[in-house]
From Swiss-Prot:
GO MF annotations, alphabetized: damaged DNA binding; single-stranded DNA binding; single-stranded telomeric DNA binding; zinc ion binding
Phylogenetic lineage: Eukaryota, Metazoa, Chordata, Craniata, Vertebrata
Source organism: Xenopus laevis
Keywords linked to the UniProt accession: DNA damage, DNA recombination, DNA repair, DNA replication, DNA-binding, Metal-binding, Nucleus, Zinc, Zinc-finger
Protein name: Replication protein A 70 kDa DNA-binding subunit
Gene behind the chain: rpa1
GO cellular component, one term: PML body
Length: 609
């Protein structure tokens, strides 16, 4: 089989600023470069059949090609995207951003032809141009020549053409791609879109106090995280806006701490006293947020605390709750949503603060999250970080594809949760909806761990005998107290006597649906939801008006609720039986329940049931 024809003259064209060519080249040699603590870098000696050049650098995202021996000496490849970077000493480096191996090294006998080392600045010998060869390289500009007009059009031209930006101080800085930034550069400018901006945060410790905020930015070549401290935080916070494009110049670069971010860059930027941020009006060609989505079905194989990108349809959403952060005693909003993708798996995802308050899941939107942290608390679950980006119905192909899947078939898929319920919700992907007959037939609760399920059922009978007891009045204790018959009540757990007590409820209820019934134990909050009265009022009513007390229980019969229950096989006196406990009891959301019934009918219809 014939070998692909090399693109003779391509090296000259690439160095001359022709960023549109996609030359076919041969790898002559690969040499690793020591980068200290950073990722390995590879320098390539490549040939276009006419010349060789040793100034090719492989972008780090392509390192796996070398590591897996796909990119090796003598192989033939096509460079589909590259960037020319000018060094301080005048040398030029070609950074290979995208590359495809056309012919592996074992199928190529050796070096093709007799290429000569490229001598930058000297005219190269002419070569017959094949049909697929790139256009002739433009002639070198003299010192007094004006740059070609195309150098100011678009991001690619900015990168390849070496255009200059006048900074506020009057100096000039070359616009370079984010992917080429490293700590050894001093004068540079990137043209990038801000995709995420955090709030200003403060800190105080033994070394002092201060403030900071962070942003994430992206251009055609990649993305990077930047942080501004103290004076720079005050200076730039009001200037920088999400989704706007800016010229960023002169920041400090260091090895990135990837523990708290999913940004794909080995370095991160810190603004300093010389940093400048200038708005860019010509921004249409700068990309938006870059995602590397992980399927929900793959989360169980990922390591705990991994920060990753996720996309899913909001199958269900729970109510907002308020929690207090112990570290600063600050109250924040918290909301759990349940996301499902085409894998059929569902994961519980926690939103915080403003994201939690403003989220509307009523229309089951597609939710994309960049930089969510994976937890193993309660199976597998996700939590949004302060550095995360949450997008609702984003304008990206993955969202359109997922929406189409869900509307056509996904809405009738119940979904398998990889997150265990921790109570509080009555709907959604982790609710494990079951009829009471299914609970019995599937032997739920017979395993080593308890099982959870959600069911709509009706109260058939309430056992009011001994459902109220006198408990310790301490806030964190619900132990039954002993009446000392002297006006005091003793709690054995607290080892104290109290002049009062509080009433607590333990209510046994028999519930039923269309196919089965089940005894279930309902504690304080669940029992109060069923009876429609709090325990204190019921205790007083029992003492003063027994008939009114009985009517409360009679009125509660034959009312339907959504029960979230825990079932476990327990053994007592050598007798084993299933014990069901209500985790949560809420009124039936008939709109949601009807939607679920319709989904089940459609599902059975497609299965021919």
């Amino acid at each position: 089989m014939a070998l692909p024809q090399l693109s003779e003259g391509a090296i000259s064209a690439m160095l001359g600023g022709d960023s549109s060519c996609k030359p076919t080249l041969q790898v002559i040699n690969i040499r690793p470069i020591n980068t200290g603590n950073g990722p390995p870098r590879y320098r390539l000696l490549m040939s276009d059949g006419l010349n060789t050049l040793s100034s090719f650098m492989l972008a780090t995202q392509l390192n796996s090609l070398v590591d897996n021996n796909l990119l090796a000496t003598n192989c033939i490849c096509q460079v589909s995207r590259f960037i020319v970077n000018n060094l301080k000493d005048g040398r030029r480096v070609i950074i290979v951003m995208e590359l495809d191996v056309l012919k592996s090294a074992d199928l190529v006998m050796g070096k093709i032809g007799n290429p000569q080392p490229y001598n930058d600045g000297q005219p190269q010998p002419a070569a017959p141009a094949p049909a697929s060869a790139p256009a002739p390289a433009p002639s070198k500009l003299q010192n007094n020549s004006a740059p070609p007009p195309s150098m100011n059009r678009g991001t690619s031209k900015l990168f390849g053409g070496g255009s200059l930006l006048n900074t506020p101080g009057g100096s000039q800085s070359k616009v370079v791609p984010i992917a080429s930034l490293n700590p050894y550069q001093s004068k540079w400018t990137v043209r990038a879109r801000v995709t995420n901006k955090g709030q200003i945060r403060t800190w105080s410790n033994s070394r002092g106090e201060g403030k900071l905020f962070s942003i994430e930015m992206v251009d055609e070549s990649g993305e990077i995280r930047a942080t501004a401290f103290n004076e720079q935080a005050d200076k730039f916070f009001s200037i920088i806006e999400v989704n706007k494009v800016y010229y960023f110049s002169k920041g400090t670069l260091k090895i990135a701490n990837k523990q708290y971010t999913s940004v794909k860059n080995d370095y991160e930027m810190t603004f300093n006293s010389e940093t400048s941020v200038i708005p860019c009006d010509d921004s249409a060609d700068v990309p938006m947020v870059q995602f590397e989505f992980v399927s929900i079905g793959e989360l169980e194989s990922k390591n705990k605390d991994t920060v990753l990108d996720i996309i899913g349809v909001c199958k269900n959403v729970e109510e907002v709750t308020k929690v207090t952060i112990k570290s600063n005693n600050r109250e924040v909003s918290k909301r759990s949503i349940h996301l499902m993708d085409s894998s059929g798996k569902v994961v519980s995802t926690t939103l915080w603060g403003e994201d939690a308050d403003k989220f509307d899941g009523s229309r089951q939107p597609v939710v994309a999250i960049k930089g969510a942290r994976l937890s193993d608390f309660g199976g597998r679950s996700l939590s949004v970080l302060s550095s995360s980006t949450v997008m609702i119905n984003p304008d990206i192909p993955e969202a359109f594809k997922l929406r189409a899947w869900f509307d056509s078939e996904g809405q009738v898929v119940e979904g398998t949760s990889i997150s265990e319920s921790r109570g509080g919700g009555t709907g959604g992907g982790n609710t494990n909806w079951k009829s009471l007959l299914e609970v019995k037939n599937e032997n739920l609760g017979h395993g080593e761990k308890a099982d959870y399920f959600t069911s709509v059922a009706t109260i058939v009978y309430l056992r009011k005998e001994n459902c109220l007891y006198q408990a310790c009045p301490s806030q964190d204790c619900n132990k039954k107290v002993i009446d000392q018959q002297n006006g005091l009540f003793r709690c054995e757990k607290c080892n104290k006597e109290f002049p009062n007590f509080k009433y607590r409820l333990i209510l046994s209820a028999n519930i039923a649906d269309f196919g089965e019934n089940q005894w279930i134990t309902c504690f304080q909050e669940s029992a109060e939801s069923i009876l429609g009265q709090n325990a204190t009022y019921l205790g007083e009513l029992k003492e003063k008006n027994e008939q009114a007390y009985d009517e409360v229980f009679q009125n509660a019969n034959f009312r339907s609720y959504t029960f979230r229950a825990r079932v476990k096989l327990e053994t007592y006196n050598d007798e084993s039986r299933i014990k069901a406990t209500a985790v949560d009891v809420k009124p039936v959301d008939h709109k949601e329940y009807s939607r679920r019934l319709i989904m089940n009918i459609r599902k059975m219809a497609t299965q021919g049931v």
